[in-house]
Every structure is written in structure tokens, then in C-alpha cells.
Amino acid sequence: MIKHYPDNASNSFLKLRNSLISATGKAIGDYNMIEDGDTILVCMSGGKDSYTMLMMLLALQERAPVNFKLIAMNLDQKQPGFPAHILPAYLEQLGVDHRIVEADTYSIVKEKIPEGKTTCSLCSRLRRGIIYRTAQELGANKIALGHHRDDIVETLFLNMFFGAKMKAMPPKLATNKGEFHVIRPLAYCAEKDIASYARGMDFPIIPCDLCGSQENLQRQKVKDMLQAWEREQPGRVNNIFRAICNVEPSHLADTDLYDFKHMSQSKAEDEDPLFGDIDKESNPALSLVSSEGFRIEFKRNIA
């Protein structure tokens, strides 16, 4: 029997846990992330996000109206000092089916990337190939990653600032060859809530030391900027995420998304914001109620 929370859990902790389960279930329902018969490879780094994702999926597995299989996976990249025993011991104690994959990507990254440069890009590409191969070997058709709402917003700004693109992390993505769907069940979950939950669960966290000082990374700078905005005006990060879910192509400038050249004068368009007020009463994307069975049944089961 899987132990979902500590024996001495407070009411506030249980409320937080239920909130995270609800947000995870809602994201899964909104994007149809999980279907009957799925085998899901749950990627575990040993950080707070992947631990939380696994626990949310295990909780939902017990009450979901569909049957799906979970296989936890950790990639041991042979970093010096990496505590290789921690995740296997935890997953065995939890009673979760798992696979530990050993691959010395650390040496490759150190050989290819000059000292002091960011290793994330190459490391990510190497990890991705190994994850896809492992999913194929295990017969998984879905790959679950632990990215949360704040990761998605940070990625939007990273791509705008450094790539001149309005591009974030989709909650669900088909791989290039169409073999797998990559899903992000924590897409609706705030990082601060995940951090609080992880502290309450006392997960055996494994820090990421491969990249060196995280403060020097572009992502950390964007994270600091967003945290400053959030302190100045609470709720701003969530509003940005809601905007990602509520795009109006006719009010942007991408000719691939909207046919500006052949736009008919007789066609009714939304009011130009230059001449009208900002729509403060627009329906937030996260309040949309799906008629899909997963979320309807999920809500019924936790009531």
C-alpha cells in the first residue's frame, strides 16, 4: 500500500495536497494527457518536481476512470558524487515499478562544453535520446515530465528574450516521429506549492550540480525577474500563464497564424485594443469546464 502523506500531516498540508491533485487532474483532463491503457514513463530526476509528479500520478491512478500503468525512470549520468542509491531505494520502498538507466553523459558534456559555459542544452539532448529509447524498450506510449506552471512561463520569456519567438512548453506534445506523447501533468501547478508539498513529504532531494552555479544561467535570471514581479503584484505569473492558454492570433502579428493579407473588411473582428478597454472580464483559461470524462469523474471521486 503506497503511503501518500505523513502520519502527522496537518490539515493545511492535506489541503495543499488536494489542491495539487485537483490541478494535476484538471490539466490531464483539459489536454487529454492520459487515456485508457496508457503506459507512462515517469521521468525522475530526484528533484522536488519529479517526486511531486509521481505522487500526484499515483494518487490519480487510484481514482481515475481509466486504467494506466506507471513506470518511474531515473537516468544516472555518472556525475561525480551522484548518490545513485537514493532513488532506487525510495522507489522500492514506495513499491513503484521503475527502471534505473546508467549512461555516462557527464563525460561527454564535459568534453564538448568549454569550462564555464552552460551545459544544459547538450545535456538535455543526450537525456532526451536516452529517455525515448528507454520508453520504446519498456513499451511506453507517454512520457511524463515534471515541468510546472512557472517553468512554462519562464520558457516563454527565455524564447522571447533570447530567441525572438513566442514559444513556451506545451502541456502535451507529440515527438517528431510521433512515437510518443510527452505530457506535463504539473502544468497548472505553481512552483511554490510544489516546494511546500515537497518539504512536507520530506522527499530525499538530489540536487543538480552538473551545471555549476545556477545563478549565472539565463533561466535563473528570468526566474528572478518573475519572482520580483510576483512580489510586486501577486498573481502576475498566473495571469501570464493564463494568457499563454488564451491567445488571440488576430491581435498579434504572425502572418502564418492569421491571414492578414486576405482579411475581409466585412468580417467581424474583435475590437482593437487601441480604441477599447482591456478585457478585464475575459474568461480565464483555467476556469473552463471540460465535458471530458476524466475530469468529471475525477471530481466526483474526490467529492
Curated annotation (Swiss-Prot):
GO-annotated molecular function: 4 iron, 4 sulfur cluster binding; ATP binding; magnesium ion binding; sulfurtransferase activity; tRNA binding
Q: List localization entries.
A: Cytoplasm
List the SUPFAM superfamilies hit by this protein, alphabetically.
Adenine nucleotide alpha hydrolases-like
According to the UniProt entry, where does the motif PP-loop motif sit in this chain? 45-50
Instruction: Look up the record and name the cofactor or cofactors this protein needs.
Output: Mg(2+); [4Fe-4S] cluster
Q: Name one GO biological process term.
A: tRNA thio-modification
- Which pathway? tRNA modification
Q: Which CDD domains match?
A: TtcA-like
Keyword check for Endoplasmic reticulum: no
Q: What is its EC number?
A: 2.8.1.-
Q: What superkingdom heads the lineage?
A: Bacteria
What family does this chain come from, according to its entry? Belongs to the TtcA family.
Q: What functional role does this protein have? A: Catalyzes the ATP-dependent 2-thiolation of cytidine in position 32 of tRNA, to form 2-thiocytidine (s(2)C32). The sulfur atoms are provided by the cysteine/cysteine desulfurase (IscS) system.
**Quaternary state and partners of this protein?**
Homodimer.
Protein name in the entry: tRNA-cytidine(32) 2-sulfurtransferase
Q: Which organism is it from?
A: Methylobacillus flagellatus (strain ATCC 51484 / DSM 6875 / VKM B-1610 / KT)
Q: Which gene is transcribed and translated to give this protein? A: ttcA
